[in-house]
């Protein structure tokens, strides 16, 4: 039994394994550890991390390792609050299963040592601050204060997470054009380093695609021009580096028109490779013109697209600010067809979440609720509930950060200089 395992581990390690593990295996969720300065000591407090805050008294026994001047001190945090000596950093290499929130003053200290940390910690710090802003534990401008420290970043995994988070921010704040300039500045060094020419290093290949796509979707003119140049050559000669295809196709759709849509669609129809078809479906969801988006949505339900690929295509359009409402309307208008095709499998819940979880207004919250009261797919109840919760999280995220982020962006345009 489990208790026997804990007892054996406890006997060998001489550590209170059973006492600690019971709080992790017999209750749901995971903790947030907040750190504040109190007099001449640090105060650590724990609470359950929730994107939608509610009263919750859950406590964990958390093994805490704090680092200061190359020394490590260990604590077992079983109470709501404990005090420790001052330290530089907590949760080295992200070995602890908890999020960390530093107060504003301590966060500045962490920012000053980021470049000395390993990739796991650089990722953990960045991911924590963004997650905390999503859950309204901190302001989103703290995330933007942090990011210039990553200007010389080279790790693929770190950049992938930064890119994903910035993409989500741009989706929720589409009118803040200063974000594009911020992203271009943040990614400028890595772009100079890796450019367009392929190196057969797996991580660099992956990194290049992320960097180019992020810059292109942030309206970097030079990157978009180079993508157009390479795509035109591809149309004439069928030659394009496979490692660059998704990035180039995505940028062509984002900056393209009806002509480019026709070219991408023809490539899709003519291709016999499923991998290529997936790339093209994903990229065609990035057009911004209403008439093209509507045409592509119709194409998705045509005989040209396999049933199992519909979710990928729908998700791509729904993840496009210009396509979300159109995708939702299309889903409602064609609900019977979606239910006929996907009503008994896993695709229907995925389609519902890919669309509805991206809304961020109370109006849409009510609209989604009303629609699924009348149309209740049997296997998607959990997906509907998750989507409604996501809308509430998104609403709070936008409401709590729209004004402060806009002000921060306007007053920090020279932050990279």
Regions found by a protein language model. Give the residues of each.
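Gly/Pro-rich turn-and-neighbor structural signature
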Residues: 1-49
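Long, ordered, helix-rich scaffold segments
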Residues: 7, 36-38, 43-45, 52-56, ...
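A short catalytic or substrate-binding loop motif that flags glycine-/basic-rich loops and adjacent residues
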Residues: 25-27, 54-59
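Extended repeat-based solenoid scaffolds, especially LRR ectodomains
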Residues: 63-65
């Amino acid at each position: 039994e489990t208790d026997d395992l804990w007892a054996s581990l406890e006997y060998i390690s001489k550590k209170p394994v059973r006492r600690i593990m019971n709080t992790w295996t017999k209750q749901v969720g995971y903790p947030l550890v907040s750190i504040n300065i109190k007099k001449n000591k640090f105060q650590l407090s724990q609470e359950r991390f929730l994107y939608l805050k509610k009263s919750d008294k859950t406590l964990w026994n958390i093994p805490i390792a704090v680092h200061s001047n190359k020394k490590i001190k260990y604590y077992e945090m079983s109470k709501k609050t404990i005090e420790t000596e001052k330290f530089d950093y907590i949760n080295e290499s992200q070995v602890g299963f908890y999020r960390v929130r530093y107060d504003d003053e301590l966060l500045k200290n962490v920012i000053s040592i980021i470049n000395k940390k390993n990739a796991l910690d650089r990722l953990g710090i960045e991911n924590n601050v963004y997650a905390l802003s999503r859950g309204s534990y901190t302001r989103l401008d703290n995330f933007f204060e942090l990011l210039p420290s990553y200007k010389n970043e080279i790790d693929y995994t770190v950049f992938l997470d930064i890119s994903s988070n910035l993409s989500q921010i741009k989706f929720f704040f589409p009118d803040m054009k200063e974000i594009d300039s911020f992203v271009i500045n943040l990614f400028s060094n890595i772009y100079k380093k890796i450019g367009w020419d392929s190196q057969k290093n797996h991580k660099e290949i992956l990194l290049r695609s992320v960097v180019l796509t992020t810059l292109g979707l942030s309206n970097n003119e030079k990157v978009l021009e180079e993508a157009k140049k390479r795509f035109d050559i591809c149309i004439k000669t069928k030659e394009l580096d496979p490692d660059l295809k998704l990035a180039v196709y995505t940028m062509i759709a984002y900056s393209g028109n009806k002509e480019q849509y026709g070219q991408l669609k023809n490539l899709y129809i003519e291709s016999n490779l499923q991998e290529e078809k997936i790339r093209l479906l994903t990229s065609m969801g990035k057009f911004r013109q209403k008439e093209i988006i509507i045409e592509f949505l119709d194409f998705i339900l045509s005989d040209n697209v396999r049933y199992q690929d519909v979710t990928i295509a729908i998700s791509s359009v729904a993840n496009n600010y210009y396509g979300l409402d159109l995708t939702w309307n299309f889903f409602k208008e064609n609900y019977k067809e979606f239910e006929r095709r996907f009503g008994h499998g896993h695709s229907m819940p995925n389609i519902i979440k890919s669309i509805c979880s991206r809304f961020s207004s109370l109006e849409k919250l009510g609209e989604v609720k009303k629609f699924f009261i009348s149309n209740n797919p049997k296997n998607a109840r959990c997906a509907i509930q998750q989507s409604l919760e996501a809308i509430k999280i998104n609403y709070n995220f936008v409401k709590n950060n729209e004004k402060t982020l806009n002000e921060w962006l306007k007053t920090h345009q020279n932050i990279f200089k």
